[in-house]
Regions:
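Active-site-adjacent beta->alpha loops and helix N-cap segments on the catalytic face
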Residues: 2, 6, 54-70, 84-90, ...
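Structural preference for beta-strand elements that scaffold enzyme active sites
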Residues: 5-9, 46, 74-78, 99-101, ...
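Conserved anion-binding
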Residues: 12-14, 18-19, 97-170, 174-175
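Short, acidic/polar
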Residues: 28-40, 84-90, 149-159, 207-210
Length: 251
């Protein structure tokens, strides 16, 4: 049995960790360096760091904060936000990231994914897709969930995987921050089309949501923010619960 992963996510804006609902109404949560240190000691399998307004504001990612975060942790770090070129990949990796998440940059220039996979290996390239239902179709959104690209999400994700994305982080805008469970319909639709690891993001509210998630084929990791940041659920408590219920975890 493949060990499943629990991944906390730091959404960073203006140097602070924030959290909202459905990608809006962002509230200040904490200092990202302190929070990274906490998760490193709390049993997280990996950490995701998103500079969530870099693409929308058309600027480079905050590398100073990223460097400090990377220096504090000893678990794999995935970083995204404002990644538009191979130079951006270089910059992020030199700051200490293990994997680079690309979203709006790939939508603008799809060739970025095969080029990055060729240079760094597909295990380094994570496709982050912000997906929402529009008129019964799963659609890809850009610029932090602000812009409907009109692209079919399932087709886009499959193309990216076929062209070098080694992992998919699927962010459901519909369930983001709502805490009623992961978007299993969307996750199943993607898992049926690709054969790379899938990280489920958006909707976690309780430990049972993760158990239900991991009963679905093709889902390798559960990502959450608010419930961990607010300590409504600790990662150790969650992993012990999952392990007791037949889901193999690294304890």
């Amino acid at each position: 049995m493949i060990t499943k992963r629990i991944i906390p996510c730091l959404d960073v804006k203006n140097g602070r960790v924030v959290k909202g609902v459905n990608f809006t109404g962002l509230q200040d949560m904490a200092d990202p360096v302190e929070m990274a240190r906490y998760y490193n000691a709390s049993g997280a399998d990996e950490l995701v760091f998103y500079d969530i307004t870099a693409s929308f504001e058309g600027r480079a990612l905050f590398t100073d904060i990223l460097t400090r975060v990377a220096s504090e942790i000893f678990i794999p770090l995935t970083v995204g936000g404002g990644v538009n070129t191979l130079d951006d990949f270089d910059r992020v990796l030199k700051c200490g990231a293990d994997k680079v998440s690309v979203n709006s940059g790939a939508l603008r220039d799809p060739g970025l994914i095969p080029a990055a996979a060729k240079r760094y290996g597909d295990q380094c390239v994570v496709l982050s897709a912000d997906v929402k239902r529009v008129d019964g179709q799963f659609r890809v959104f850009a610029k932090g969930g602000r812009e409907d690209t009109g692209r079919d999400a399932l087709e886009w994700i499959k193309w990216c995987v076929d062209n070098g994305a080694g992992e998919v982080c699927l962010n459901s805008i519909d369930t983001d921050g709502v805490r009623n469970g992961f978007d299993l319909e969307m996750l199943d639709a993607v898992a049926a089309r690709v054969n790379v690891p899938i990280i489920a993001s958006g909707g976690a509210g309780k430990k049972e949501d993760f158990l239900e998630l991991f009963h679905h084929k093709g889902i390798d990791a559960g990502l959450a923010a608010g419930i961990f940041h607010q300590k409504l659920l600790t990662i150790r408590e969650l992993k012990e619960y999952l392990n007791e219920n037949g889901v193999e975890m690294r304890l």
